[in-house]
Every structure is written in structure tokens, then in C-alpha cells.
């Protein structure tokens, strides 16, 4: 039996047994900077789960691994949540080098990969997926939990072999409980999806998730990314200037209702940005009359453009994400004088699958909308 590590007084201890004594560990599902996710089967029940092996930081001076505080924060949040659109935590084990989270197995793949394989998609169908995302975020926000890493890669399907698959929000490595009266600042997340207040190192709240939902919706309807530039400086400048538009090449078949939904999310001033409740009540999500409902049914997503632009976006992202993160980190270090070894966790969550391994084929052509 392994020695128990130092932990917060209120944190329920992690099991110190060998996870392999209780689970058969299978194939790798994904990997990140300091984490590997593998399929596993519980020996006592035969049920399948996902085992997330998080590499522990061994000392404050180390550049490798995740700090105890960050691991405990993720576990604490996962232990609080129970919602059909949010991944669930089954158990936690610990050994000398890793903390192992036994998570619900979400095996249907990414939502956007599923959409790219469809032959047609109306806005009505698209909003059924957005509504599930909003429902999951609404649950988190009622608990004052901000995800801070909402992006297509973290929106998964429980089972893709049904007409309207069940969405699961995953990866709570950057999630944070927002406390009233306590200022929270950080530079983290995936740059393409971060809100201006993150780039500018301003106080953060639940509003940052709403910005990310705006970016996700924009990409879902077009395949193009609203702020992704040819350089890291251009991307960050686009975000802080809220520089985007609805290029006719990508949005010729998009309804004004859908564009209005996006516009009201991609607002720089956090107080003027839609809240999760306001987003759920928006007529694109919840039509108030037959005319609005008909607009959603008759407006279609250009899936040919979506497939082409989404693949190009993924290719570009695989080459730009590291330099973007490094730029964000350097900016933060200048503002708050961080040690260089404190930056690694902040670029993105550690369960982010290695983007370079994905099947991206063509470079993306820069347009005025992205």
C-alpha cells in the first residue's frame, strides 16, 4: 500500500491501492502534456471506464507534472457534479507518480467529427446540440463552476449511433469555482477560444464560458474560426478587438437568428454578454413563435464548407497552438512576474489530446471572418 500524500484538510483522501488491482487497463484513448487517458474495465463488475493518469509534480521547482492543488481542484469539482451532459467521476487512485481518475467512458467521439460525417444538418438540428451544451454549462454555472476550457475537443458524444447523440462536457482540468467577492485572474485555456478578459489578465467569472460558446457556435455553423489568425499576434489582437464578421462565403445560408445569438455572446464587456439563462431563452434556442421555429427548420448548415474549413482549422491549430500558448504565457509573466516553470499548466488542460496526432489534411486559407 502506498503512503498517503499531503492533501487539503477538507479533501477526501485518494485511494492508495494499485489501480491495476481493481481495473484491467486497456488501450490509450488520448494524451496531453501531463496526462494519459486509457480505457479500463472494473474487475468486480465488468463495467468499462476511462482512466486518466495525471503525472504529479514532484517538487515546486519541477517543470514536469501537475501540482497537488490543481489535481485536488479538478477532483473536488468532479465530485460535485452529476448531470447528464457532464462527465462523471467514478473513483480516484494514487501512487507515487500519478493520480488516476476513473471517469465515465465517453466513446462516441467528438461532436464536430460526428457533424462532419453527416449529409445534411438544419439549424434546428444544430440547436439541439447547442442546447445540450447550454444545459450542461447551466448546471455548472448554477454551482458557480466555470469550465474555462470549452472547445470542440471537449464536447463529446456518449454514443454516436443514434440520430441525436447525447453530449458530454469533458476535461475539468482548468475548471474553477467562482467565489463571490474573491477576485480570480489567470491566463489559461486554448487561445482560439479564450475570452478577451483572459488575454488581458482581467478578473474572470462565468462569462468566459459564454464567450467560448459563441466561438463554438460560429465554428459549428461554418467550420471557420472567428478569431484564428495567421500568427499568434493576429489571433490575440482579433480576440481583444473582437474582430470578426460573417463572411458570405461561410454564412450565406445562416439565419439572422443564429447570427444574433453569436453576436450577443461575442461581446467584449462581460456585463453585456449573454448569461447562460439568457442564452437558453434566446429565440434561436427557444423560438417564441412559429415564424422563428420555421426559420430554424428551413435554414441549413453548409456541411461541405464545414468539413473543408474544419479540417483546415485543425491543421492550422496543430501548428499554432504551442506558439500561441507560449505568447500568452510570456504576456502573463511580464504582468505578474511568474517563474518560467509556472507556465506549463496554463497553456491548456492536460487531457487535451495530442492535436498533432489527429487526421488533418489541408492547410486552412485565411479569410476575413477568421
UniProtKB/Swiss-Prot annotation:
Result of altering residue 323 to A: No effect on Ca(2+)-calmodulin independent phosphorylation or apoptotic activity
Chain intervals with Basic residues compositional bias: 358-370
Chain segments carrying region Autoinhibitory domain: 292-301
Keyword Iron: no
Keyword Phosphoprotein: yes
Reaction(s) catalysed by this chain's protein: L-seryl-[protein] + ATP = O-phospho-L-seryl-[protein] + ADP + H(+); L-threonyl-[protein] + ATP = O-phospho-L-threonyl-[protein] + ADP + H(+)
Chain spans, region Calmodulin-binding: 277-344
Modification sites for Phosphothreonine: 369
Region Disordered, residue ranges: 348-370
Residues engaged in binding ATP: 29-37, 52
E.C. number: 2.7.11.1
GO cellular component: autophagosome lumen; cytoplasm; cytoplasmic vesicle; Golgi apparatus; intracellular membrane-bounded organelle; nucleus
Cited function: Calcium/calmodulin-dependent serine/threonine kinase involved in multiple cellular signaling pathways that trigger cell survival, apoptosis, and autophagy. Regulates both type I apoptotic and type II autophagic cell death signals, depending on the cellular setting. The former is caspase-dependent, while the latter is caspase-independent and is characterized by the accumulation of autophagic vesicles. Acts as a mediator of anoikis and a suppressor of beta-catenin-dependent anchorage-independent growth of malignant epithelial cells. May play a role in granulocytic maturation. Isoform 2 is not regulated by calmodulin. It can phosphorylate MYL9. It can induce membrane blebbing and autophagic cell death.
Domain notes: The autoinhibitory domain sterically blocks the substrate peptide-binding site by making both hydrophobic and electrostatic contacts with the kinase core.
Protein name: Death-associated protein kinase 2
Gene source species: Homo sapiens
